[in-house]
Structures are given as structure tokens and as C-alpha cells.
Amino acid sequence: MRSRMMQGIGRGLLLVLAALALAGCPSSQQEKSRGETLKQYETIVRWSQWDAAADFIAPEYLEEHPITRLQMDRLRLFRVTAYEVRSTGVFDEGMTVRQTVEIRLFNTHQAVERAIIDDQLWRYDVDLKRWLLYSGLPDPTQRH
């Protein structure tokens, strides 16, 4: 009798653990892709790889807001010392993400660090099956 009770408790515990494991997993490939994309972008920005970061920008956004040589040269003056996600919101049934990030930048020529806020807008492209950035690269000239 005692062993049956222990088996029942064991099964119940396994069911609870399985439910918790599933709750912690992304419910779709799109959600998994979102997490991977945001992490990849964060890593690229942390390493100050601005050309690679530009590859995340949506082509239609680039048509309206092309990245100038001056903007890229300006970004290359800086090394990222910190990248901290302040908030993330998911909208439009998971198709849009707004993320606010504080980025600390060290100016290699002036030996000065500054903090900027990067408001990112990400949208999932169903045809390409990937997340694209619709807000451009961080602006090291911003003042707040």
C-alpha cells in the first residue's frame, strides 16, 4: 500500500515537473528565433561589430534611412563597455518586440564613457522567417 502511494506521488511529481519544463520552453519556433536573434544582436553590439549589427536591419528600413559613412565612422570611435536590457515588450500577437537597452560606450579617442538609450523595434518577417530591426543602429551622439 505504501509503495503504491509513493508511486502515485512520484508520478504526480513527474507530471508537475514536465508541465513546468514545458512552460519554460518557447511555445513556437518564432519565439525561440526571437530570443536567439536578440541574444545574437546583443553579442555583436557588445563586441562593437557595427557592420555585423547593420545586417539585422530590415531592408525597407534601410531604404528610408540609409546608414551613412559618417554614422559608421562615428560608431567605430566607440567600444561598448555594457549592454543592459531595461525593458522588453512583445506586441501584435508576438510579431513585434520593443526593447529598451542602456548601452555604455567608451570613446577611444577622448577616453570618455557615456551611456545612451537604444530603443529597438523588432518585427518578425514571415517570408524570411527571421526577426528584423526597424529602428537602426544605436546613436552615440544622443544626449539625455
Which residues does each PLM region occupy?
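Bacterial signal peptide processing site
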Residues: 26-28
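C-terminal motif of bacterial Sec signal peptides marking the signal peptidase cleavage site
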Residues: 22-24
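Short, aromatic-enriched amphipathic alpha-helices that serve as compact interaction elements
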Residues: 30-46, 56
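Short solvent-exposed beta->alpha transition segments
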Residues: 35-36, 50-97, 105, 111
